[in-house]
Amino acid sequence: MRDFDVIVVGGGHAGIEAAHASARMGCKTLLLTILVEQIGAASCNPAIGGLAKGHLVKEIDALGGVMGKVTDLCGLQFRTLNASKGPAVRGTRAQIDMDRYRIMMRNLCLTTPNLTVAQEMVEELIVEEGAVLGVRTQIGREYRSAKVIMTTGTFLNGLVHIGNRTSSNGRVGEPSSIKLSESLRSLGLEVGRLKTGTCARIASESIDFSVMEQHPGDLPPPPFSFSTKKEEFAPTQLPCYVTYTNEKTHEIIRSNFHRAPMFTGQIEGIGPRYCPSIEDKVNRFKERERHQIFVEPQTLEATEYYLNGLTTSMPFDVQEAMIRSMAGLQNARIVRYGYAIEYDYVNPVELKHTLETKKIKNLYLAGQINGTTGYEEAGAQGLAAGINAALSVKGEEPFVLRRDEAYLGVLIDDLVTKGTKEPYRMFTSRAEYRLLLREDNAEFRLLRHGARFGLVEEEALLALQKDEQSIHGGLVHLRESSATPSKETLAFLEEMGEEKINDKTTWLAIAGRKSFDEAKLRKISPLFEEMSERALGQVLIEAKYASYIQKQQESVGSMQEMLKVKIPEGFIFDTVPGLSLEVIEKLKRFNPPTLFAASEISGITPASLDVLHLYIHLRGKESVD
């Protein structure tokens, strides 16, 4: 007899999304966490979103997750990054009140129907005949369930470093989970070691902001959640500030390399490539005269500021000296020192696309345990794992997104097919079809799924369907109606500040001009006057990027057709030029019957599939000739 349908281990960003989704989908869910007060804690930087990460938050929101909604409720500053660039690479970012975010997330978990929260450390997975049956906690209690989702963050065998001092913690002040890590190893899962870190926090009264650059938020502020009403969204926004390291800072750091844990061999785990510590930056980029440091508020009261860009595990005296060498921080009082943390993770090639482990049935992994870094990557995985665990409990088909459907699809596909030996971070460059996967169309791509799972209200789906009809009608109107260079039309274009036309031109072409905006589009026809802001924005983007969007859609279609291609029986993979030895070895071992089956094999890249497809096609032509 089982106590719960789903057990979630860990109350961080992945665990919250997993537990919330599972419970909302009707599964009796248990969230086990070391400290209830720390559910939803933002352990590192006080921000949500950013380039590519903002896409993930929007996708979480469209699927019915909670990260975007809570961020809108406790954000301190909202900005659109890359606002001057194309819509595919723009990213929403928000500074958050870390205290309010944590409290809101904790209260959400404590009040969600079907969700039970308990403060207990899990020490062991109960596994019989290759399937997980539940967990055993530190106090000796057993909980039985149909599914278990591990969202343990940095707590698996966590080790904190400040100078030559180490402590067994999953986060400063909280114990690490050593026995649970041993339990995973005993099950035959490939466990590795990674490292991440955080920056010092400074008392606000000790900072001289007058000598720093000020960075305000955007007006109007861009919210994350589609459910947030833009016209009513008016959060109190606080500025961030910028200072810089200098040659004195670098000399202080260089002269203490012999005391840096990452250089002495004390730290063995591999750190994030794209978020290196300041000592690593000074060592690797010797030609750089300075590095930018963002001084960011942590709460609405702004009593502490976070030094973004100054991640470090240097001894406390070195941290004090290097911080006080920078403009505006000469009298800085450190409230909390920066530190590095090593932790265990499971190589994600151990997972299916549902995030269930291949070796242990009914066991799902999500978040940093899979080798990722970032709140957004964790939350997205947690949501996917929670949905899939709940669907499996109900006996329904799994939920797997393709690379052309969502950044979440790219994220999971990268992890399970390629694995990772270093903390994985999402970038827009990882998505081949990024023009189709914009922030602004996340609801149009994914909200239907959220509604199908019961995570999104019916009202939101109806509003989406209405907008889809408006968009279709608007694009048809633009394609099928034309403007001629008549006196009236030329006067109309001049009134809008648009260049004149010399020949008959479709309104789609005119609307596709860089200078053409929503206000001008509304003047073309009553059809656009009545359209919602969301729908109007989609029409304009479709008009401006019509040919590029069409090319990507055709590319997606070609890929889907390619995956249907059968691999001839007895095919000799060694004869295919351009395939690596590793790829050939895997293809020979699994002998996939189709290119789709080949794509499911860990380590088989889209480029490898292209090469294989071309060779099969050429072989087929030769046999016909």
From Swiss-Prot:
Pfam families: GIDA (PF01134), GIDA_C_1st (PF21680), SAM_GIDA_C (PF13932). GO terms for molecular function: flavin adenine dinucleotide binding. GO terms for biological process: tRNA methylation; tRNA wobble uridine modification. The keyword Cell membrane does not apply. Keywords: Cytoplasm, FAD, Flavoprotein, NAD, tRNA processing. Its cofactor is FAD. InterPro entries: FAD/NAD-bd_sf, GIDA_C_N, MnmG, MnmG-rel, MnmG-rel_CS, MnmG_C, MnmG_C_subdom, MnmG_C_subdom_sf. It is found in: Cytoplasm. NAD-binding protein involved in the addition of a carboxymethylaminomethyl (cmnm) group at the wobble position (U34) of certain tRNAs, forming tRNA-cmnm(5)s(2)U34. NCBIfam families: mnmG_gidA. Homodimer. Heterotetramer of two MnmE and two MnmG subunits. Belongs to the MnmG family. This is tRNA uridine 5-carboxymethylaminomethyl modification enzyme MnmG. It comes from Wolinella succinogenes (strain ATCC 29543 / DSM 1740 / CCUG 13145 / JCM 31913 / LMG 7466 / NCTC 11488 / FDC 602W) (Vibrio succinogenes).
